């Protein structure tokens, strides 16, 4: 080990580790390098999208599953011609399908942009404003909570204990007269 470097049993040249487990910034021992290479990092921005099941969390199960039978129904005894009923079904289904696709094509990306900005702002405000305000409030309220606790233990506890002892001997007899 001369000059701050050493050679392992396989002939690889390494710098001297800063600590026994290796450099915390850059792994320079084989065990740490292998351990880091085995870990798989998953990023929410690079995950694959399921093009078959587009509602995996079932957000829209009750709301938008509208079929022809959910909207238009003819009761017994009041039926239109079979051809009209079939044409109405086809017209409704195809119109709903293609108009949804048209609206998605026109407004899907702008709406995704708007909702992405909205939730980014919401996340930003929650992380950088709401949580720090709540933590600050909890720190500041500790002083008041201690004073309040002392007040309750020195004034309220004895007072309510005395009132409880006064009324502990009260007996109520209910008689039902017929």
Curated annotation (Swiss-Prot):
There is a cross-link at residues 5, 26, 30, 39, 47, 57 (Glycyl lysine isopeptide (Lys-Gly) (interchain with G-Cter in ubiquitin)). Residues 2-104, 126-178 are cytoplasmic. The modification N-acetylserine is found at residue 2. Residues 2-94 are annotated as: Required for homooligomerization. It is found in: Golgi apparatus membrane; Cell membrane; Membrane, Caveola; Membrane raft. PROSITE patterns: CAVEOLIN (PS01210). Residues 131-142, 167-178 are annotated as: Interacts with SPRY1, SPRY2, SPRY3 and SPRY4. The modification Phosphotyrosine is found at residues 6, 14, 25. The modification N6-acetyllysine is found at residue 5. InterPro entries: Caveolin, Caveolin_CS. It is a peripheral membrane protein. A lipid is attached at residues 133, 143, 156 (S-palmitoyl cysteine). Signal peptide: none annotated. GO terms for cellular component: acrosomal membrane; caveola; caveolar macromolecular signaling complex; cell cortex; cilium; endoplasmic reticulum; endosome; focal adhesion. Residues 149-160 are annotated as: Interacts with SPRY1, SPRY2, and SPRY4. Residues 105-125 dip into the membrane without crossing it. Pfam families: Caveolin (PF01146). One of its GO terms (biological process) is muscle cell cellular homeostasis. Homooligomer. Interacts with GLIPR2. Interacts with NOSTRIN. Interacts with SNAP25 and STX1A. Interacts (via the N-terminus) with DPP4; the interaction is direct. Interacts with CTNNB1, CDH1 and JUP. Interacts with PACSIN2; this interaction induces membrane tubulation. Interacts with SLC7A9. Interacts with BMX and BTK. Interacts with TGFBR1. Interacts with CAVIN3 (via leucine-zipper domain) in a cholesterol-sensitive manner. Interacts with CAVIN1. Interacts with EHD2 in a cholesterol-dependent manner. May act as a scaffolding protein within caveolar membranes. Forms a stable heterooligomeric complex with CAV2 that targets to lipid rafts and drives caveolae formation. Mediates the recruitment of CAVIN proteins (CAVIN1/2/3/4) to the caveolae. Interacts directly with G-protein alpha subunits and can functionally regulate their activity. Involved in the costimulatory signal essential for T-cell receptor (TCR)-mediated T-cell activation. Its binding to DPP4 induces T-cell proliferation and NF-kappa-B activation in a T-cell receptor/CD3-dependent manner. This is Caveolin-1. The gene is CAV1.
């Amino acid at each position: 080990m001369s000059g701050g470097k050493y050679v392992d049993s396989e002939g690889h040249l390494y710098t001297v580790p800063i600590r026994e487990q290796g450099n915390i910034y850059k792994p320079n021992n084989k065990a740490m390098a292998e351990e880091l290479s085995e870990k798989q990092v998953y990023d929410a921005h690079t995950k694959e999208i399921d093009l078959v099941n587009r509602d995996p969390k079932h957000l829209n199960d009750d709301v938008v599953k509208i079929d022809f039978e959910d909207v238009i129904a003819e009761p017994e005894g009041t039926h239109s011609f079979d051809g009209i009923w079939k044409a109405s079904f086809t017209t409704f289904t195809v119109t709903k399908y293609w108009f949804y696709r048209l609206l998605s094509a026109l407004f899907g990306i702008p709406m995704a942009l708007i909702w992405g900005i909205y939730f980014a702002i919401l996340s930003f405000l929650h992380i950088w404003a709401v949580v720090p305000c709540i933590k600050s409030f909890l720190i500041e309220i500790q002083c008041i909570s201690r004073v309040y606790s002392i007040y309750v233990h020195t004034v309220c506890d004895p007072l309510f204990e005395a009132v409880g002892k006064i009324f502990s001997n009260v007996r109520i007899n209910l008689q039902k007269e017929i």
